[in-house]
Amino acid sequence: MEILLTGKNALVGGSSKGIGRAIAERLAASGASVTLMARSEDLMARIVESLPTDKGQSHGYLVVNFSDFPAYKAQMDAFFAKNTVDILINNTQGPAAGSALEKGIEECQTAFDLLFKCAVYTSNLALTAMQKNSWGRIINVASITVREPLNYLALSNSLRSALVSWGKSLAIDIAKDNITLNSILTGYFDTERLTQLYTQKAEKMNVTAEKVRGDMEAQVPMQRIGDPEEYANLVCFLASQQASYITGTSIPIDGGLLKSY
């Protein structure tokens, strides 16, 4: 199935590496003009240079810090004063790992800004043009821990759950405007973030990182870690006209890891 996003403008959070980068590259390959958002200007500048422009696309980037909401808000206000977005990908790096007992109120507030507040604010700004044009796509990058929490990811579990619940509520309100909103429940994917998590876990358990990664792979019915390109393919479909009747849902992409259904 060929997916064409020619003429669409996409804003992709956390897109200097990992899943976010794969999403940006896949949307651009399908014809979308993509604006990347992340902290690393050097990485984003190189990615933008590599993105295709054969379908008339124009790409760019914004250097942002999702953990600094006042600064982020000012940047988004300035961006949306001059630009419109058809496809919004709410994606950021996750908060620091740790159990609920290890996290204080300040860390909870930082995680709230990072995973929830920025996504809500950006979505509200993007919706103005989406509603005017009677077309839009909002996709939240969440986690399978929304359904089956991991105790060492207490902040991610909590705030991503809030994001998914908010997304479901908003999806009902904007469906009449031909705007879809879906959340993706992310399993294990081969990214720097995953490497960081299993390396930290290995240090706590006094075992090798390879042992922890192997145990992760063994938990997955498909017996492997996912490729970010596989993730990006799902996002590209949800961003397309072919997915026009899919909204308000949470879609796991985890190789069968979730035991619930």
Each predicted region: which residue ranges?
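Substrate-binding pocket helix/loop in short-chain dehydrogenase/reductase
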Residues: 99-112, 138, 216
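Catalytic loop of short-chain dehydrogenase/reductase
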Residues: 139-163, 167-176, 188-189
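Alpha-helical segment proximal to the catalytic Tyr-Lys
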Residues: 128, 172-173, 244
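Short, small/polar-rich loop/turn modules that mediate ligand/substrate recognition or access, typified
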Residues: 175, 180, 246-248
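Conserved glycine-rich Rossmann-like NAD(P)H-binding loop of the short-chain dehydrogenase/reductase
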Residues: 32-47
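Conserved glycine-rich cofactor-binding loop
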Residues: 9, 16-17
